[in-house]
């Protein structure tokens, strides 16, 4: 896993070059938005349980067959596994957000996840819907500027949404 800073330095080093002005500007921008980034991650972390629970409720309301006998989330053990998996995805999205880079999400969470779900008979499309529901809740929290530094957060919100989109696509 590399954060945005380590990644830029590694790329420049591999080419035997100094950091370009464009790279320095991008890193400078990331530093300037650091408090906003921390606020977004803090909001997600502080509301993680509600994000997961409410997203699962919404998923099961749309797809009640999942919690009926024979469904993939039927029995408390399977339901707990579903909620655990949703929480893990949310946690790794928050790691990617703080790092400003998706590699931790890809390397430690998403790689091989589709194959695992296929082997277990878990419907990837349902997992994808659950991830999208967590995205909606997290983006709403990120867009709530109450108690956060003022300024445009649209780039951070778009970045956050992209990590959820990446996760949703990886399981189908």
From Swiss-Prot:
Keywords: Antenna complex, Bile pigment, Chloroplast, Chromophore, Electron transport, Membrane, Methylation, Photosynthesis, Phycobilisome, Plastid, Thylakoid, Transport. (2R,3E)-phycocyanobilin 1 binds at residue 82. The keyword Plastid applies. Contains two covalently linked bilin chromophores. It comes from the Eukaryota. It is found in: Plastid, Chloroplast thylakoid membrane. InterPro entries: Globin-like_sf, Phycobilisome_asu/bsu, Phycobilisome_asu/bsu_sf, Phycocyanin_b. Gene3D superfamilies: Phycocyanins. It is a peripheral membrane protein. The modification N4-methylasparagine is found at residue 72. GO terms for biological process: photosynthesis. One of its GO terms (cellular component) is chloroplast thylakoid membrane. (2R,3E)-phycocyanobilin 2 binds at residue 153. Belongs to the phycobiliprotein family. Heterodimer of an alpha and a beta subunit, which further assembles into trimers and the trimers into hexamers. The basic functional unit of phycobiliproteins is a ring-shaped hexamer formed from two back-to-back trimers contacting via the alpha chain subunits. The trimers are composed of alpha/beta subunit heterodimers arranged around a three-fold axis of symmetry. The phycoerythrins also contain a gamma subunit which is located in the center of the hexamer. Light-harvesting photosynthetic bile pigment-protein from the phycobiliprotein complex (phycobilisome, PBS). Phycocyanin is the major phycobiliprotein in the PBS rod. This is C-phycocyanin beta chain. It comes from Pyropia haitanensis (Red seaweed). The gene is cpcB.
């Amino acid at each position: 896993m590399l954060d945005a800073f380590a990644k830029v330095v590694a790329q420049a080093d591999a080419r035997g070059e100094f950091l370009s002005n464009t790279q320095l500007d991008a890193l400078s921008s990331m530093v300037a938005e650091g408090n906003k980034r921390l606020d977004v991650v803090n909001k997600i972390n502080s509301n993680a349980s509600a994000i997961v629970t409410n997203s699962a409720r919404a998923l099961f309301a749309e797809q009640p067959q999942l919690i009926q006998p024979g469904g993939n989330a039927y029995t408390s053990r399977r339901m707990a596994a579903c909620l655990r998996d949703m929480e893990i995805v949310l946690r790794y999205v928050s790691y990617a957000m703080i790092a400003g880079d998706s590699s931790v999400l890809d390397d430690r969470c998403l790689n091989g996840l589709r194959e695992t779900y296929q082997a277990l008979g878990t419907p990837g499309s349902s997992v994808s819907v659950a991830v999208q529901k967590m995205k909606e809740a997290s983006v709403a929290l990120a867009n709530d500027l109450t108690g956060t530094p003022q300024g445009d957060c649209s780039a951070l919100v778009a970045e956050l949404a992209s990590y959820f989109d990446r996760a949703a696509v990886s399981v189908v």
